[in-house]
Amino acid sequence: MNLFRKISEKLKSYEDWVTEANYYLDEGIYDKAVECYLKALEKKNTNPIDWFNLAYALYHLEKYDSALEAINEALKISPSNIYFAYLKGLIHYKRGEIILAYKYLKKASEKIKNEELFEILGDISVKYGRYEEALKYYLKSYKMANSKNLNALFKAGKIYLLFGDIDKAYDAFNEILQQNPSHECKKIVECMENVVNAINSYEDLNNGLTMIKNKDYIGALKIFNKVLQIDENSDISYYYKSVIAEIFEEYKKALEYIDKSISIFNRSLYYAKKGDILYKLGDEEGAIEAYNKAIKLNSQNPYAYFGLAILYYRKGELEKSSNFFDKVLETYLEELSEEDISALNLYSLIGKAETTGIPKYYHEAMKYVDNLINLENSSRWWYVKGYIYYKLGNYKDAYESFMNALRVNPKDISTLKSLAIVLEKSGKIDEAITTYTKILKIVNSLQFTCEIDNILEKLRSRKPTNLEIPSVLFDIPVMYHKPNITCFYASNLWKYMANNNPIGAYIYLSFIESYISLDEISQMVNDIKSKLSLEMYRYCELIDDYKSDESVLMQIKELLQKLGCML
């Protein structure tokens, strides 16, 4: 058989070999096509098409050196053939000879309108950092008649991200999904939509905070649940749900919510709140661990220091407590609201007075309680003011302050009891008796009634009760963070970048930019935006394997510190 085949091959003409070679080429049987073209060229080597077809078959066999030799032969015979130049450009591209490839492909693109050609020119332009040119080629590739080159459109979308043009990138990716719903850009589009929904939720979150302040806790819960329906990863919504559960003394539920916040965003603020809740659940060790974790994540977290100060105060470890109150007073609190700053300073100064025995701290605390009363005519703040006067031995002003508290909340038992103690110490025994009698009419509790009856018996016998007003440090209101809009955006900027999502980070940074006025910070924002553009491009290249650049993370952290934002 081999002998017969050899004889048969010798009898074949040039035309026979070309016909057979063309058949194999059309069928994609490139190795056979190469054999036949070589046989044909042995008989006649002056037809440039044969050399071109041989080069084409070798190209598909990834034999690029031989393919280059063949296409060079074709070009020797027909140097102006644009299709030969096109194939030579492709071969150089595969050989990694980018400059030569660009030269021939660019020349070919003047006459050949081919989606693959434009896409490769786009790829080469990207390699040399000519992104505007690359975008032009990718869009040409996609917009070719009957083109379905979604890959080119995807690459165009990535360059839009590199330019920081989120809207055009979103439109490009959406167009891809209309034709291929399972395309890898689906994750990117979902990310963009989720971020926009989260940003739009700020007004709802702010309304929820207002409701908490106004003690409309159920209304606030509804708001935060609404936000979670829109953005299931709204860590801040779970934080406020935890706060509400803590206010209602449902500490296990509060712990569940704050753990959910932490699972979404490993944030110092949330560990401080977890410490508060664990302490109220009786887990002192767990609380200390949570507070220390908060401080490790952010050494400027006043809530963590305050939680530790209160914990050690109630344990009777006054030196430790005093040191942590110092930390609160030393911490720069720019991000916090005026109300939060005043409350933390107020209780910390009272704490310093009671852990050191230095009365001057009470005097310093007075200006903060006055500020709080000006912000909100609350019975709590009038009560604290009365307590401070009481500790300073000023029973007259303590009486006036407690009376002001009762004008806001006439049936508050703690205030009535404190008022009675002040009256007794002022020598106004009959008025103290009247006040205790009033308490009996309000409270319907056998144990409490017996306690008051014993006090009344002593007072009527003109015997001292030796009662003291308990420290306000045993009745701290639930503390929680109320971020302004800039810090809300800033914390989310950090969250998204820390969670390897530069697109979300870039969108939040764009919103922060409109609230920045300082030139120094504006320059930093511009620098980070530029780096995030590159990170977005890299993210689209890697998707699931992407990891945020540590240097960009550190720069974002520095920006947050300059903005006074607490993580």
Swiss-Prot record:
Superkingdom of source: Archaea
TPR repeats: 14-47, 48-81, 83-115, 116-148, 150-183, 199-234, 236-268, 269-301, 303-335, 344-379, 380-412, 414-446, 505-538
InterPro entries with a match to the protein in the record: TPR-like_helical_dom_sf (IPR011990), TPR_rpt (IPR019734)
Record-annotated disulphide pairs: none
Keywords: Repeat, TPR repeat
Name by which UniProt lists this protein: TPR repeat-containing protein MJ1428
